[in-house]
Amino acid sequence: MSEKNAYAKSGVDVEAGYEVVERIKKHVARTERAGVMGVLGGFGGMFDLSKTGVKEPVLVSGTDGVGTKLMLAIKYDKHDTIGQDCVAMCVNDIIAAGAEPLYFLDYIATGKNNPVKLEEVVSGVAEGCVQAGVALIGDETAEMPGMYGEDDYDLAGFAVGVAEKSQIIDGSKVKEGDILLGLASSGIHSNGYSLVRRVFADYTGKELLPELEGKQLKDVLLEPTRIYVKAALPLIKEELVNGIGHITGGGFIENVPRMFADDLAAEIDEDKVPVLPIFKALEKYGDIKHEEMFEIFNMGVGLMLAVSPENVNRVKDLLDEPVYEIGRIIKKADDSVVIK
């Protein structure tokens, strides 16, 4: 018995792995940007930092996955957008530190290589990279029979960005009186899906719930996470924002305090938060306490900006979208986030 046949009998399809590599090359090519060195398939991805033109570069890195949202992608057999979620979760964290994302690497683990399915996943990764302006310089697909079921896979991503040292956003510039501006989310994004799946466990996904304005439930649940890089970068370059919060797992309560020092707090006007229909549906069908919703979900705001009052109009002018003035920074009394 040859080694090749022995490996196949253990559940690893080497030929399918080669096919995956060939299928994804055209998607990787879409993400090319200045600074990329070498080609996909080497032992390490390379990037020439001098091409960024940054004078005092500080590298900022991020890694994340998409949690159990993957289980819905598998359940509904829709794999072409989940990669965008993975990119978004990484690059949105990087932009919150004031850095421009440069490149991205993904890791896919599966029980059985399915070249068509994995190409769909990577096509979504590439689309996310294009939206974020980052290069996909590394991809690892691990076939692990016995670790995962044949139809199962997991997806993780890694991103690196660069910031001018003087433009790093670390919370130290946020001050009392700053205005909190919210940028709309596209939906649930990629957090809270263990609860989401429990709430809708008995649904097929084809339902047209009255709250969802004519959209099928599965389409709303799998709406890809919005990528904020191109919206936020011009604001960072002009030094118009004092703090940025990426509203992910833990919702407002956990993420907003990460924007500022411990002696400050955020006062949020709930009436000005653009709550999306899916959150109203989750609260209703899941019998979730209203205040708990803000502890779990983004509630319609995926990125929050702390801006000096004199810069608010300029920020609104630069953002080609609705901007929601949802609160302000105050001196901390008890809680770090006060929702009124």
Curated annotation (Swiss-Prot):
It is an enzyme of class 6 (ligase). It catalyses: 2-formamido-N(1)-(5-O-phospho-beta-D-ribosyl)acetamidine + ATP = 5-amino-1-(5-phospho-beta-D-ribosyl)imidazole + ADP + phosphate + H(+). One of its GO terms (biological process) is adenine biosynthetic process. Keywords: ATP-binding, Cytoplasm, Ligase, Nucleotide-binding, Purine biosynthesis. Pathway: Purine metabolism; IMP biosynthesis via de novo pathway; 5-amino-1-(5-phospho-D-ribosyl)imidazole from N(2)-formyl-N(1)-(5-phospho-D-ribosyl)glycinamide: step 2/2. It is found in: Cytoplasm. CDD domains: PurM (cd02196). GO terms for molecular function: ATP binding; phosphoribosylamine-glycine ligase activity; phosphoribosylformylglycinamidine cyclo-ligase activity. InterPro entries: PurM-like_C_dom (IPR010918), PurM-like_C_sf (IPR036676), PurM-like_N (IPR016188), PurM-like_N_sf (IPR036921), PurM_cligase (IPR004733). GO terms for cellular component: cytosol. It comes from the Bacteria. Transmembrane segments: none annotated. Its EC number is 6.3.3.1. Belongs to the AIR synthase family. This is Phosphoribosylformylglycinamidine cyclo-ligase. It comes from Streptococcus pyogenes serotype M5 (strain Manfredo).
